[in-house]
Amino acid sequence: MSDASFDRSMPLSGEGSFGDYFALLKPRVMSLVVFTALVGLLVAPVSLHPMVGFCAILFIAVGAGASGALNMWWDADIDVIMKRTAGRPVPAGKVQPGEALALGLGLSGLSVVMLALATNLLAAGLLAFTIFFYAVVYSMWLKRSTPQNIVIGGAAGAFPPMIGWVAATGSVSLEAVLMFALIFMWTPPHFWALALFMKSDYHDAGVPMLTVTHGRKSTRTHILVYTVLLVPVALGLALTPVAGPLYLATALVLNAIFLKGAWDIWRRDEAQAEADKYATEKRFFKFSLLYLALHFTALLAEAILTRSGLWTFGG
């Protein structure tokens, strides 16, 4: 636990607006969850009624929002310390901790039950596990206890495309596993790049990020190693029926750029990084978001083109 002077049980006088309660759901994170889940659902080799697909994505989004609310409730004591998170609704006093907890628990139950009714029990079970893993295993345990928090905890963010696939097909396949693995392996370089230029925030909050426990030099090496391990996963998807030339070309370009970025980070020393205010690290972090989005966009584009009859590869 952090030494921050924040009590989750304390009453707060501020009345939150709709925007404050919506912010509890972490809409930016939710948008990535929704998109990757949508891709997982649409690239699946089955015919799905549009209403079933809509309901599946809606309830996956609700589940993601529930996870965000539970995370904000639990992390309020460290969020109040970190500049990047101090303005969140709970530490800012706009929403009471108990309200965030109630919203998170309520939406968790609703999303799991409704996804089971709309699709199948396996998809609902995966959603329930994802919420539990993020809110309990990652937020309450891993995040504050080990520098491997992001490595293990990254599984929570990697499940959405698998849930989308299972919602459509009712089973797990190699394609679903590789989409999961793509996000899972991408997560450490993405967040460690952030930690390179936000080290002081994590240190002050008592979060044992790799930069805090092992230093920036070790973190740079870890970023390069995990990026190298990420490349075959990304390219491996091109060998499955859901991908084709478009995805392969996209993946080759993106991974070449990503590898170059990781190499540039590894070569830098702290004097260089401080001199340009971590410009290379910030650029790598921003590109990592585009990297993931474009991989899934390429998968989605191939699925749409194939089903429309305009594309003869993949699918």
Swiss-Prot record:
Gene3D superfamilies: UbiA prenyltransferase. GO terms for biological process: heme O biosynthetic process. The chain crosses the membrane at residues 21-41, 52-74, 98-118, 121-141, 150-170, 177-197, 223-243, 246-266, 284-304. Its main location: membrane. One of its GO terms (cellular component) is plasma membrane. Keywords: Cell inner membrane, Cell membrane, Heme biosynthesis, Membrane, Transferase, Transmembrane, Transmembrane helix. GO terms for molecular function: protoheme IX farnesyltransferase activity. Pathway: Porphyrin-containing compound metabolism; heme O biosynthesis; heme O from protoheme: step 1/1. It is a multi-pass membrane protein. Its EC number is 2.5.1.141. It is found in: Cell inner membrane. It catalyses: heme b + (2E,6E)-farnesyl diphosphate + H2O = Fe(II)-heme o + diphosphate. Belongs to the UbiA prenyltransferase family. Protoheme IX farnesyltransferase subfamily. Interacts with CtaA. Carbon 2 of the heme B porphyrin ring is defined according to the Fischer nomenclature. Converts heme B (protoheme IX) to heme O by substitution of the vinyl group on carbon 2 of heme B porphyrin ring with a hydroxyethyl farnesyl side group. This is Protoheme IX farnesyltransferase. It comes from Dinoroseobacter shibae (strain DSM 16493 / NCIMB 14021 / DFL 12). The gene is ctaB.
